[in-house]
Amino acid sequence: RMVNQNRNVFSACMVACGDAQAMVTGLTRGFRVSFDEVTRAIGPATSATVMGLTTIHARERTVIIADTLVHEIPTPAQLADIAQQSAEAARRTGLEPRVAFVSFSNFGSPPMPSGERVAEAVSILDKRGVSFEYDGDMSADVALDHELMKRLYPFARLSGAANVLVMPNL
């Protein structure tokens, strides 16, 4: 009955069964309702951190923003997982991921709790030996403007403007 009467549950089941590659929702229901319906129907993958991705396409540029929907204050391990899963999502859409952990501070200046969590997340990714570029913490303007990044922070690891932004808190 739940599958037949709820379009989110029906769509989620189609994705889970391989009859659809993705689902789009939210026009008539808010995020929390949609999220609860989908996770109740199919649940998260056991090896994944549940998160939300927002994709913006503008001016011949694509930027993925994570996680702006699920984790209010993610732990460093969750931030590392979110970065890794976001990079995988970027690759699936044809982007070569350049991940920036966005914050109010830039590389620990001024010192902030979110910056400390980001520094630990970067350390976790270093230990994992992931195959994508990542750096942070940095402000959004620095992350999205590679010339500014290189001028102000020549030690930054990213080879271009970030195309994946990971938020350390909502």
Could you tell me what each predicted segment is?
Residues 1-159, 163-170:
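Anion-binding alpha/beta catalytic cores of soluble intermediary-metabolism enzymes, centered on
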